[in-house]
Amino acid sequence: MSRILFYGLLLICVFLGFFFFFKKENNVIYNKIIQKSEDKVFTDETYTYLFKDGNLKELVFIKSEFMDPKLEHKKNRNMTGYLIDAYRAMSPSYNFDFAVHDNKILGFKSVIFEGFGDAQVSKHENNLPSEKWQQLKGFNIGDPNINEKFFHLKFPFTVKNTLRVTLSKGFFNKIKRLKRLKIVLVSNEDKEYKIDIENFLPKYNL
């Protein structure tokens, strides 16, 4: 009887160990939103990785697609122009959103992807469509000083600072091949927020 009890407890321990490992390895929340407007379709797929400790709370990867039959027709016919070139460059688009909580409004002056120190970084605002997006070589981190006039303020509540990093298609394809995502965010106060996690992107059809 005692032997049966022993093996029973052992099996329970093995099961619990597998369960917690499984939960840890699948710490990604997936969501898909589809919106339609007349004959146009907007699709957002989000993959959210939650951090347990520190002010860096989450990393969200976003794949966005915009389907416009008229522009798609022009794209397939290899036509050029302001709108069709922007559509070709940014459909689909790939973004990382980083959420950092603090009692202040933060700016981020630098983003470093380990292994890609020579990547071309732009710092223009996230406004589409724009000829700037057609010229995007590496990634864009936005204007780090857009909220500079608020940097000196401290608030009696938590401020959710979101940094959006837009990746070019070529840079995204390089990121997908990494085994781990090692990223450093540098704030306007020179504080570093470091990320070192398993690269979950190859697990999905992106």
From Swiss-Prot:
It is found in: Cell outer membrane. GO terms for cellular component: cell outer membrane. Residues 1-23 form the signal peptide. Keywords: Cell outer membrane, Membrane, Signal, Virulence. Virulence-associated protein essential for survival of the bacterium within the tick host and therefore within the natural life cycle of the spirochete. Belongs to the BptA family. This is Protein BptA. It comes from Borreliella valaisiana.
